[in-house]
């Protein structure tokens, strides 16, 4: 979503690219524990990482990270759960995430999901810093662990209904509350 980025192997020193930049693996499953994720402050520093295959780069976004799992049915968002990251980090890993039914994504993030996932049924995870989307995956965060941690069987049942039966039971919505928690 408007992010200046590209494949690292195609990046050459360029006066139009403002440093710092951020580099990371192109495939999300290869970034566990922020492996091979770096803030690059100079073109000389970048040369240390050029040999690593399948990296991407993006502008560095100095803003708090958030993440939202959306559940869609035929392109309509039927549920969302937003995870707020701690401002403190160890490397690029947050100290904690705050999960609450009161957390809401930025409207611009939801608008992007509605526009680009028109007709989609299932789960989508959107990670963003400020109003810039940095990663999108057709999955729940952490394999659904945060949803399971709500310990709300009605919420879990309704999400399963979307995937297994292409159905969202709106009658369960008043039973889908859960207590806020930190992870």
Predicted regions: what they are:
Residues 1-112:
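Active-site nucleotide/adenylate-binding loops and adjacent lid/helix of ATP-dependent enzymes
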Residues 88, 101-183:
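ATP-dependent carboxylate activation and anion-phosphoryl transfer catalytic cores
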């Amino acid at each position: 979503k408007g992010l200046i980025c590209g494949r690292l192997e195609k990046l050459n020193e360029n006066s139009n690219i403002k440093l710092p930049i951020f580099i990371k693996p192109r495939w999300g499953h290869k970034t566990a524990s922020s492996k091979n994720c770096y803030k690059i402050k100079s073109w000389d520093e970048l040369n240390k990482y050029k040999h690593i295959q399948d990296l991407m780069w993006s502008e560095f976004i100095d803003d708090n990270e958030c993440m939202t799992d959306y559940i869609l049915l035929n392109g309509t968002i039927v549920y969302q759960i937003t995870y707020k990251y701690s401002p403190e980090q160890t490397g690029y890993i947050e100290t904690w995430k705050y999960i609450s039914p009161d957390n809401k994504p930025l409207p611009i993030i939801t608008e992007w999901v509605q526009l680009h996932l028109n007709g989609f049924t299932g789960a989508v995870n959107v990670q963003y810093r400020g109003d810039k989307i940095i990663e999108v995956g057709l999955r729940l965060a952490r394999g659904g662990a945060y949803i399971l941690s709500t310990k709300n069987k009605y919420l879990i049942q309704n999400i399963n209904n979307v995937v297994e039966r292409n159905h969202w039971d709106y009658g369960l919505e008043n039973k889908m509350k859960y207590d806020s928690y930190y992870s």
